[in-house]
A protein has these predicted regions:
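Active-site rim elements
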Residues: 540-544
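Active-site neighborhood of glycoside hydrolase catalytic domains
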Residues: 547-580
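Short secondary-structure subsegments characteristic of cysteine-rich extracellular domains
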Residues: 499-508, 569-580, 584
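Aromatic-rich carbohydrate-recognition surfaces in CAZymes
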Residues: 394-414, 425, 466-505, 546-554
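Short, Lys/Arg-enriched N-terminal segments with co-localized hydrophobic residues
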Residues: 1-6
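Ser/Thr/Asn(+Pro)-rich, low-complexity disordered segments
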Residues: 29-471, 511-515, 519-520, 524-527, ...
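Alpha-helical scaffolds that organize eukaryotic protein assemblies
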Residues: 485, 495-502, 506-524, 559
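Bacterial N-terminal signal peptides
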Residues: 13-24
Length: 801
């Protein structure tokens, strides 16, 4: 596929232009075979044309300009914190933390955020330090290169005049390197955007003491509107106030650079200055999943180049999801910065090591103990809504993907329950998933297509912006999950379609540096610990709403990796799951009370942006969905919410208070609004499945009782709803199992230990999707507490000895 990529690109772009020129709709694309699966070698033209603008969204995505210094055919990132930089003339919203950088027609504006909006939802970007040049008028900003959490771009005027800028997430520093430009520095006005400050900045030396310009040397500090910056330069540099009020920078030799550091205070300049002269040229996150220890070990590597002889190491900051639960020695004795993601603690160096526990994930739960009436209820739901229904499955990648995972869950429940509906459900799942994972020329929907310019697989029909890679991990995680489960249930599916399913997984989570077909970790921000949803980015950065679906995409990777025997895929899934689940807790729910700004009046948020938090969603202001979208889809992968004792109950109590207040407010605001009770029944079937699916990780017995009550109510449309089949089963299983015992782990990533809070009984559970029996050992710390022999293609459970 890699060798043929150039030929496919030439053919496709030619046929795109001809098709558009003639105004025809072309649906034929070549078939690219992968095992028994396949995909279309090019995206469909004419399928997604806006009725008003007549713009074809697919052609626009493939054909839009990407701002690069050199386009060597490398896979172009999408969904990144710097995405706007790749796709706009002047990239903005580059939140490196604790600062934001905007490229402008004058150079760059550096906003050092030190406070929040009055309601606590935004990190304020005010009074920037501006880096430009004498008569410097860049025509655009162009990406020069990127690492796992760094990006370099060129503020470009001509081949002989430019400024290269390097940014790194968590690096409170901006590196500027000049060619043919005499630098100028000045203080911007309140909102930046080319405005000038009304007040004159103050200046200080590397020792933090005031100085008066002109100054000659290697360091100058600037204090403006409560913000302190350290400016490091080559020896012999002169800083002087010019006739226009800007600071003229004159280097003693050819070329030159300026390094701008954010400082908590003047006294911190010396520390930053010492580390300013090593510019990061690449960053890499390396990881190892230790099955025996139940640990994820990561190494954060910063490759630097010296701007002066002997310089090495950078100041690197880390956020709460990284340092709070870290088991390695990590010296974070440098400056600290308050951010909208909590305290960023800094250390200095080129390599930083961490270790975090991973206690397993399961695709479902086994039949344990007395399942009560749940088995009978589930049997009826499986028969009515899955085995005997003629209702078609979704035709776009979001709803089609969700349906596939629901069917996979239903098939798994049927297998565990020994229910007679298994065969019919499994057959329908296989038929539909196989259809999605293969392409037939001329078909209108349910296939994947290759974007040769942007390098990625997009499913059609697309939905919610997925044609430009928005929500890619949400959608495609469902397919990967379904493929993993079906690989267990159907002995031939993995050999036939496993390679194609793995290709879909790589599209959103490419973990292999050697596989250049896709950008690395397309949707994941390794430093922030969570994914970003938008493929194009915005002027304010990027965002993510549904943490539940993001976590699900990583759980799916673990499951498919185990089903295919691909340890690298599994390890990547563990890495993503460990960090995304921690980030979901920390930054959407603030369980420790030290992340949300003090003025923020809610206990959770529905969405986060690069520099802000949002009480809301893209589609509603109702708390039922602000909370609920974080719990989509229900399943064992959400068990991480139980890591913090009492968090599930505390969070749900917060939801109920918010929903009650919302109902009161809407009733007063809108005459036509009918106030709804804050009950499970009022949520409807699908949404209720997410709420109950979350609550069962806190008090499964209570959820089971509520389901029984709803089931017995005449005309019930919630407990009888198709979305509830797996919730009935899993809640009943958890009623017997209890909650995850976070002290314990198994030697398989698809195993867990549960402990019942009342009986004290602990139970080991393990999944084996393979063709041979597996033995899984279980440990509490380093003490072995039992083992399970798991038959092929099954799930097993047993009591801890």
């Amino acid at each position: 596929m890699v060798e043929g990529g150039g030929m496919k690109r030439v053919v496709l772009l030619g046929y795109l232009s001809v098709s558009l020129g003639l105004g025809r709709v072309v649906v034929g694309q070549e078939v690219v075979r992968v095992g028994e699966g396949s995909y279309a070698g090019g995206p469909p033209v004419g399928k997604m044309v806006d009725g008003k603008t007549k713009v074809d969204a697919v052609v626009e995505t493939e054909g839009r300009r990407v701002y690069l210094v050199e386009d060597g055919g490398r896979a172009v990132p999408s969904n990144k914190w710097y995405q706007n930089l790749l796709l706009k003339q002047y990239g903005t919203g580059l939140w490196a933390m604790p600062h934001r950088v905007d490229a402008t027609k004058e150079g760059i504006e550096i906003f050092y955020s030190t406070s929040y909006s009055g309601d606590g939802v935004r990190a304020l970007t005010e009074f920037p330090l501006v880096v430009g040049g004498d008569e410097f008028r860049p025509v655009d900003s162009r990406v020069k290169g990127w690492g796992d959490w760094t990006v370099a771009f060129r503020s470009y005027e001509s081949e002989g005049r430019w400024m290269d800028v390097t940014l790194g997430e968590g690096m409170p520093t901006v590196w500027c390197e000049f060619r043919g430009v005499v630098p100028r520095l000045w203080a911007g006005g309140h909102g930046g955007g080319g405005s000038r400050a009304e007040r004159v900045p103050g200046w200080f030396g590397v020792d933090g003491k005031p100085v008066t310009l002109p100054v000659k040397g290697a360091a100058l500090g600037m204090r403006h509107e409560g913000r302190c910056y350290g400016i490091s330069a080559p020896e012999g540099t002169e800083f002087a106030i010019g006739a226009d009020g800007r600071v003229a920078v004159t280097f003693a030799g050819e070329g030159g650079f300026l390094v701008i550091s954010m400082l908590p205070a003047e006294k911190d300049f010396a520390v930053s200055h010492e580390r300013a002269y090593a510019v990061p040229r690449d960053t890499r996150l390396e990881w190892e999943y230790d099955r025996e220890a139940g640990q994820l070990r990561t190494e954060w590597v910063v490759e630097t180049a010296p701007l002066k002889p002997g310089a090495k190491g950078v100041i690197q900051g880390f956020l709460p999801h990284q340092w709070r639960d870290n088991g390695e020695r990590l010296e974070l004795d440098g400056p600290e910065f308050g951010t909208i993601r909590g305290v960023m603690k800094c250390g200095a160096g080129e390599r930083f090591r961490m270790s975090h526990p991973f206690r397993g994930v399961l695709p479902g739960l086994p039949a344990v103990g007395e399942m009560g009436g749940a088995a009978e209820r589930v049997s009826g739901l499986l028969r009515e809504h899955f085995a005997e229904t003629k209702k078609p499955l979704g035709t776009d990648t979001y709803w089609g993907g969700k349906d596939l995972q629901r069917y996979a869950q239903a098939a798994l429940v049927a297998a565990e329950a020994g229910d007679g509906s298994r065969g019919a459900i499994e057959a329908r799942l296989k038929e539909s998933l196989s259809d999605w994972l293969s392409y037939k020329p001329g078909e209108a929907a349910r296939y994947f297509a290759w974007y040769p310019r942007r390098k990625g697989l997009v499913g059609f029909n697309a939905a919610y912006g997925s044609e430009h890679f928005t929500d890619t991990h949400f959608h495609q995680g469902y397919f990967v999950h379904a493929a993993a489960v079906l690989s267990q249930l159907d002995a031939g599916f993995a050999s036939a379609y496993g390679e194609m399913a793995a290709l879909v997984a790589k599209n959103y989570a490419n973990w292999d540096r050697g596989d250049e077909r896709f950008p690395r970790l397309r949707t994941f921000d390794v430093w922030r610990g969570h994914s970003y949803a938008d493929g194009n980015g915005f002027p304010e950065g990027n965002n993510q709403e549904s943490t539940g679906e993001a976590v699900n995409s990583w759980a799916a990777l673990i499951l498919l990796g185990e089903a295919l025997g691909d340890e690298k895929m599994t390890a990547a899934g563990v890495m993503g799951y460990v960090f995304e689940s921690r980030a979901a807790e920390e930054y959407w729910f603030d369980p420790h009370g030290d992340v949300f700004p003090a003025a923020y009046e809610h206990e959770a948020c529905g969405m986060i942006w690069s520099g802000s938090i949002v009480w809301g969603t893209w589609f509603t202001a109702s708390p039922s969905w602000i909370y609920g979208i974080q719990w989509v889809p229900s399943g064992p992968q959400l068990s991480f919410f139980g890591r913090e004792p009492g968090l599930v109950e505390r969070v749900y109590g917060g939801y109920e208070r918010e929903q009650e207040a919302f109902e009161v407010k809407e009733t007063a605001r809108r005459k036509e609004y009918r106030r709804q009770p804050v009950t499970t029944a009022a949520l409807g079937g699908e949404l209720a499945s997410y709420h109950l699916g979350f609550r069962m990780h806190g008090d499964a017995a209570k959820v089971v009782k509520e389901l029984e009550t709803l089931w017995n109510e005449p005309g019930d449309k919630v407990a009888h709803n198709e979305w509830m089949a797996s919730v009935h089963w899993q809640a009943a299983a958890l009623k017997t199992l209890g909650r995850v015992d976070w002290r314990c782990h198994g030697t398989s990533p698809v195993s867990m230990v549960y402990g019942h809070p009342e009986t004290g009984v602990r139970t080991m559970v393990a999944w084996n999707p393979g063709a041979a029996a597996r033995t899984v050992k279980f440990f509490e710390g380093k003490k072995e507490i039992g083992e399970l022999s798991v038959p092929p293609r099954s799930m097993a459970s047993g009591r801890v000895r």
